[in-house]
Each structure stands twice: as structure tokens, then as C-alpha cells.
């Protein structure tokens, strides 16, 4: 098991580092000014985003997440995803590596027909449109996908969709043109073969965006939408994959995507730690620099330990997917999804505490980062679901020779 960076990954890291320091960090003030002036109800992209996308393309820093485009493995891409986490609202989109588009592009690449790829994947890869993934429902516990109630009924040459979704991330962005909707097509089939996915253009009659739901009172720019689907009719050719394959497609989508999310979370944690260290070097309390206070040193050391431990676990998951596939890595992916967001929350929380009142204000990115990563402990499966999966795997594991000898 070797996590050393390849020459290709090192080259990308160098170029991405230069891009971040020369263009991305300096663009954050422009981005924030635009958002502040536009107001929370406005979901348009600040012009600086398109400028950065052009620069990223020119530098070959585009679609790095998709191996078919970049040639990078999951392990090679992981540290690059972490780097983008230092500027979570700008860097991933500037590189066309932002969720939910990344997962949607992956499943279109894996399961889409030639026509579907030409119509939707190509514009997404070119950064001309955006997309959303519509799976979670307000009326049921959607952490168990078998509960999904939205129906996708065959009617001649069409499918008709009825149901209500929420937390459909990305649907409020005016550039969002396509929704990937998961619903029940085969109610009499086995539990994990009842669901399917269909491609729904966002302007299809019957699609109504009810609202964009705030996260801890903050409206994300791309929105997290509650959507009503009422007799939404799309051609049967809009089926993604096969009928009954929705659950399998969702699992294929979430494997690498969770690694991307978790590595970005560690990038955000690194930024919080950097802010913490800078703060304690420059503040004095009770006649001594904060950096000399034992409790502060403990917070810094604990944060470094946790970030590095979580990173190694993420790298192991990425390596396992590369070597053995998503199925073999599923428990490792569950582990990182339970670990990385909590680590990020804990590190950011310590940084907030060190900053005092400034930490909960908009003068630093810490409050925003905390809100996002606390939400991350719920989306893509709550902690409890992943911990349940890990525990069940451990309980079903055959005893090792040593375990058998001592138990």
C-alpha cells in the first residue's frame, strides 16, 4: 500500500498551488462582495467564477476528478481535492470539480447512452451548464433509499414522475439545466431493485421549485431546493441505466464523491488550523501570547493529529477503490464519511474558540465553514448510517488467528 504522489500528481499539485495563490484566494473578496450585494435570494454566479474557469482551462486544471478526462486515479486526485477545500466556495467550481456536478458527470459517463452523454455530459464537462441530483424526500427517512416514495411510472413511450424532493442541491442556480431524479419504477421488485433514475430537464412542465432551503440560516449560492414533481412527463429514453438500477447507480456515484467531499473537508480544516495558529501568534492575554497558553497548544496539537489521521484513512479508501473497486472499499468509504466531517467540525470549532467573538462573525470564514461541515455529517448519509455499516461489517468478520486465540 503506497500513498506516495506520482510524478503526474506532483505536477498537478504544483500547478494547482500556483493557481490557488495567484488567482483563487485573491478572488474571495470579489466573490463575497458580489454575494453580499446580490442578497440571499440571488443564486447567480459572481462573474469572477467564469473568469477563473477560463484561467483554469488554460492551465490544464479542468475536470481533474474524472479519470477519463484527466488520467488521474482517485489516490492522485485526493490531495488536489484537499487543496480546493481551502477555498470551498470558489476553487472546486473554478476547476469544474464541484458537487453535485462531479457525481452527476460520473454516472452519466458510466451509465449514460451516447445520446445522453452528448446532450448532457458534454456541456457539463465543458462547464456550460450545471446540474442537480434529486433523491432526498421530506416525508420519509431518506437515509434508507428503500423508503423513497416518488413514483416513476411507464406510460407508453414516456415516464411520468410524481413526488416531492428536497435538498436537491444546485437546482436554484440559473445555469442548472438537468435534474437526475431517483424514484420507484418497480414497486413489486426486491427492495434494492425498485428504484430507477431518470434525466429531467429542469424546465419540463410539472417541475416546480418550491423553495431553496437555508443551511444554518445561510443560503448557499447554488441552492438546496425543495421540488414538487406533478405529472412530469419525459421520454423513456431519459432512463439512466436500466429499470431497477437506481440504488446501484447511487452507490457508484457516492463512492468517489465521498472521497472528494472528505478531502475537501480536510482542506477546510487545514485552513481553520492555519487561521488558529496565526491568531495565537498575534494575540496576547493575561500578559502572555496565546501561543504560550497550554490549552491553546493542546488545541493546535490535537487538530494536527486528527487531520493527519483522517487524511491517511481517506488515502487508504482512495487507494482501495483504485486497486479493488468501489465494492471492496465501501466500508472504508463509510469510515471516512463518518470521520472527516467530524474532524473538520472539531478543528473549526477550536479555531472559532481561539478567535473569540470574531470566530462567530463574518470577519473570518470560520462560521460559514462550521455550518457547512456540520451539515456534511448529515448529507450523503448521516454519521449513524455509516457507523451502523462499519459495525455490521466488524461483527460479521471472521475471527483472526490471534482473536481466536484470546477469545
UniProtKB/Swiss-Prot annotation:
An example Gene Ontology molecular-function term: acyl-CoA dehydrogenase activity
GO biological process, one term: fatty acid beta-oxidation using acyl-CoA dehydrogenase
Entry keyword set: FAD, Flavoprotein, Oxidoreductase
Main enzyme class: oxidoreductase
Pfam families for this protein: Acyl-CoA_dh_1, Acyl-CoA_dh_M
Keyword check for Flavoprotein: yes
Family under the similarity heading: Belongs to the acyl-CoA dehydrogenase family.
PANTHER family xref list: ACYL-COA DEHYDROGENASE FAMILY MEMBER 11 (PTHR48083:SF13), MEDIUM-CHAIN SPECIFIC ACYL-COA DEHYDROGENASE, MITOCHONDRIAL-RELATED (PTHR48083)
Protein name according to UniProt: Probable acyl-CoA dehydrogenase FadE2
Protein species of origin: Mycobacterium tuberculosis (strain ATCC 25618 / H37Rv)
